[in-house]
Regions:
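Phosphate/adenylate-binding glycine loop and adjacent helical scaffold
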Residues: 189
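Regulatory extensions appended to serine/threonine kinase catalytic cores
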Residues: 197-325
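Long, polar low-complexity intrinsically disordered regions
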Residues: 6-13, 20
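Generic preference for well-ordered alpha-helical elements
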Residues: 42, 53, 83-94, 141-144, ...
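Conserved structural core of kinase catalytic domains
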Residues: 15, 22-87
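C-lobe/activation-segment region of protein kinase-like
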Residues: 33, 109, 118-184, 205-246, ...
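Catalytic-loop of the protein kinase fold
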Residues: 88-119
């Protein structure tokens, strides 16, 4: 598979070998990206390899990884969040992993020192990684587990306990479910940019409410009954004055999972109603701030929503790829 690509690379870089391993169907590549498996090859990236790239462990030192935010309405609360720059990098590293649910490509002994980042484009690529085209469920699971360990140790030096709860759930998912939850991992809510979180939630909500509920009511009901959400979510909402105004604008039944989702949807859609102080003509918050307020009160609800859809093979139908470019 793609042997001509590997041979041409060996010719371009005499110091690198690209010969097949003694085992049928297994190969070694000096530098590969997901494009290799569809016959593509970005020559510019690899021509920069000797001098214009850094190992992942060095590149992350150039990036601000976290920042602290104070969601409006929570004067004494500060949240540590991931920066968009580090989210972009982790999304791109994940994009190097072929989808084990649709592709039979798997890597052997994937380590942090296999991952380099092009300094001009900021795109990561794999260097000297071995792969096989034979399906192996253990390798599928192991690939994502090892990438998760890269995130944990190489990027955050093991200090993940203070990081956002949804990101910790992503790491847990990568450790145990890489063979079955690849789409949920690649498009996880913890890696969405702050400004896109509303779009992510509303796409998932609208698919579930407008399509799935009519198409397969049993699956819809099963998902709603399986959602994890704070038992006192309505009380948590009313600890924030801006969320309280939105909560009081409708009637909600606190014991139903779908009501939590309905509140989040309404809060996103109508959040700008109370975003300005009419007396001072000053903006109080924007849609990204609303996302932080909702995450403070309703942590892990979106993670649970994504996961329950993915368990049933439904998350793919929403086509979230455009939000994770």
């Amino acid at each position: 598979m793609a042997s001509s690509v590997f041979n041409s690379r060996a010719n371009n870089f005499p110091g690198l070998s690209a010969k097949a391993s003694p085992f049928f169907g297994e190969h070694s590549s000096p530098a590969i990206s997901l494009a290799d498996f569809s016959g593509g090859f970005d020559g510019d990236m690899y021509s920069q390899l000797p001098s214009m790239s850094l190992p992942l462990s060095e590149y992350v030192k150039l990036i601000t990884k976290t920042m602290t935010v104070s969601p409006p309405g929570y004067p004494n609360h500060r949240r540590l969040v991931l920066t968009d720059d580090i989210k972009r990098l982790m999304r791109r590293v994940l994009a190097l992993m072929p989808d084990p649910e649709t592709n039979n490509i798997f890597f052997f002994k994937l380590k942090a020192n296999n991952v380099f980042v092009d300094l001009l484009s900021g795109k990561p690529f794999l260097h000297a990684a071995s792969w096989t085209a034979n399906y192996d469920v253990n390798l599928a699971r192991m690939n994502y587990a090892r990438v998760g360990e890269m995130f944990r140790q190489t990027i955050f030096s093991g200090a993940v306990a203070s990081l956002p709860a949804d990101f910790q759930q992503l790491l847990s998912l990568m450790k145990t479910n890489g063979d079955t939850a690849s789409y949920a991992i690649q498009h996880h809510c913890s890696l969405i940019w702050r400004v896109d979180k509303k779009e992510l939630f509303t796409r998932i909500y609208d698919f579930s409410n407008d399509i799935l509920q009519k198409w397969n009511y049993m699956s819809y009901t099963d998902i709603m009954n399986s959602l994890h959400f704070p038992a006192n979510w309505d009380t948590l909402i009313q600890q924030n004055p801006y969320l309280t105004m939105l909560y009081r604008g409708s009637t909600y039944y606190p014991n139903a999972g779908k009501e939590v989702l309905r509140f989040k949807r309404n809060a996103y859609i109508h959040c700008l109603q109370y975003a300005w102080d009419m007396a001072t003509k000053q903006k109080i918050y924007d849609q990204a701030d609303m996302g932080e307020m909702l995450e403070t009160a309703l942590s892990l609800v979106l993670h649970s929503f994504q996961l329950e859809l993915d368990k049933r093979g439904l998350l793919r139908h929403i086509r979230l790829e455009s939000l994770y470019l």
